[in-house]
Regions:
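A short, conserved structural fragment
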Residues: 2-14
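Conserved adenine-nucleotide phosphate-binding loops and their immediately adjacent elements
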Residues: 13-28
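Inter-lobe coupling/hinge segments of SF2-like helicase ATPases
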Residues: 25-31, 35, 39, 47-499, ...
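Short, locally clustered residues in the helix-turn-helix/winged-helix DNA-binding domain
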Residues: 42
Length: 506
């Protein structure tokens, strides 16, 4: 039939990318505070290549980003919009698609490899995306005429790729990428990292502040609860104080929503032998293993290795193995016992391993199908929920007691960000902050939302102890199958480095 001319054969490439036309809408006008910040950013870009936008939570930074993107697109250039978490792309994609339609491309690791290859090839072709929205790996996409890079929530440590190689920090790498195109970089956050704030106030970066919340929404009221005394009095209901239980109950009666934050996934951070104190540790990393009840296994959260749960203690033979601490999995079980009628969801790495899992959890919460959302740091990162009136930070101490010079900075950032999810519209939100260390300066700084004081405290300490931003740290990692050879090589290398660098080598 083809030979007789009845049929004709056409070859058409069928891709996985959405190529249909989308109806777009006009961008929202900026309020006076946003307009002033927007003009200040443009002024900074006339003098500096990098600008830090320090805006409080719910101040409407995303609308400023959209106006800036539109200006760059009018000039015929491309935009890279970086986010720290895949979860954030779900909400922001809808906002950006309404404005930019199919000029917007999405890129992150939850897409299949074949789909990511198509995006890569599209960027190399003649019909490339003008705006790329993605996570840290997006910086490696090919661009032809990059004009602006936006790094939202620039303080997040998830921008740093640790393992596997290549090891890089997407914020710093994006600044280098922009310099290759002569493009500008906007760093946006409510809680800047100390290094970025130092660069801003020292004049290396431009600096713009946005201190008003959108539509005059009040900052949430943060109430401190000392759980150390309550635990001694045996008044705690699992990880929940009586005050938090009361507020959750009242919020549910008002048909409002609740977020419970605990930056530890799994059921229990560790198990321990009640008789001899033995704690199972990872054979690769030598850190305690986290118990996951749903999978009935022990998992190392550093390397991902899994172990069977022992029936008895291998050290003394006792069968009295106790769960110590609590993670999001246990919180989910406990809250269902207290509020059996509530609709509860959990958002952590274990429940969001697929591309659609994020979207379903967030969509259900937005549509009011979920009453209580339990989560790790995923719930703290820029998500907007209109009906959240109560946020519970279940144990602030777990964020503070890390052997890391950035632990207090990161604890402040996490608590301030998750507190910002409360009271989004028409009502001041309430944050219940549970801690055993109520007198720590960083706790007081969270309550008063005093970022400047946190910065000056941390900056003074780091200058004394020779930490960034005053010094740079280089970690040299050596590995060999024979320990004696490794020790000898490490000593020899340290001696050579000390001959040139002196006491700066540890």
């Amino acid at each position: 039939l083809v030979e007789k001319g009845v049929f004709e054969i056409y070859y058409q490439e069928i891709g996985r990318l959405d190529k249909g036309m989308l109806k777009t809408t006009d961008i929202n006008p900026l309020n006076p505070a946003q307009q002033q910040a927007y003009q200040s950013v443009l002024q900074c870009f006339r003098e500096k290549n990098v600008c830090l936008l320090h805006g409080v939570t719910s101040s409407g930074k995303t609308e400023i980003y959209i106006h800036l993107i539109q200006e760059v697109l009018k000039a015929g250039k491309q935009v890279l919009y970086l986010l720290p978490e895949i979860a954030l792309t779900t909400q922001i994609t809808e906002r950006l698609k309404r404005v930019f339609g199919h000029r917007l491309g999405i890129y992150h690791s939850k897409f299949p490899d074949a789909e990511r290859v198509e995006i890569w090839q599209k960027q190399l072709g003649d019909e490339e995306y003008d705006v790329i929205l993605g996570v840290r790996s997006s910086i490696f996409l090919p661009f032809k005429n990059l004009g602006l890079v936006i790094v939202d929530e620039e303080h997040e440590n998830t921008y740093k790729q640790q393992d596997p190689a290549p090891r890089y920090h997407a914020r710093n790498s994006s600044i280098m990428l922009a310099s290759m195109f002569g493009a500008k970089v906007l760093l946006g956050t409510a809680t800047p990292c100390v290094e970025s704030y130092f660069n801003a106030i020292s004049g290396k970066y431009g600096f713009v502040e946005l201190k008003e919340r959108y539509q005059d929404i009040q900052l949430p009221h943060i109430e401190l609860v000392d759980i150390k005394e309550l635990a001694h009095q045996k008044r705690m209901q699992g990880p929940f104080s009586p005050r938090l239980v009361k507020e959750i109950k009242e919020a549910l009666e008002r048909k409002e929503q609740v977020i419970l934050f605990q930056n530890r996934r799994g059921f229990a951070p560790m198990i321990e032998c009640h008789t001899c104190g033995w704690v199972p540790k990872c054979k690769n990393c030598d850190v305690s293993l986290t118990y996951h009840k749903g999978l009935n296994q022990l998992t190392c959260h550093y390397c991902g290795y899994t172990y069977q749960v022992p029936r008895s203690c291998p050290a003394c033979g006792s069968v009295e193995l106790m769960n110590r601490g609590f993670g999001t999995e246990r919180i989910e079980d406990d809250i269902k016992l207290i509020f059996p009628e509530a609709r509860v969801a959990r958002m952590d790495l274990d429940t969001t391993r697929t591309r659609t899992a994020y979207e379903k959890i967030i969509a259900d919460f937005e549509q009011g199908k979920t009453d209580i959302l339990i989560g790790t740091q995923m719930v703290s990162k820029g998500l907007d929920f209109d009906h959240v009136s109560v946020v519970g930070i279940l144990n602030a101490d777990t964020m503070l007691n890390y052997p890391d010079f950035r632990s207090h900075e990161r604890a402040f950032q996490l608590m301030a960000q998750v507190a910002g999810r409360a009271g989004r519209k028409n009502r001041q939100g309430l944050v219940i902050l549970q801690t055993k260390s109520p007198d720590l300066p960083v706790i007081r700084q969270v309550i008063s939302n005093d970022y400047e004081q946190l910065y000056y405290d941390q900056s003074a300490e780091r200058q004394i102890f020779k930490y960034p931003p005053y010094y740079r740290l280089i970690y040299v990692y050596l590995k060999h199958r024979k320990e004696d050879v490794l020790d000898m090589a490490a000593d020899a290398m340290a001696a050579q480095l000390r001959s040139g660098l002196g006491s700066r080598v540890l």
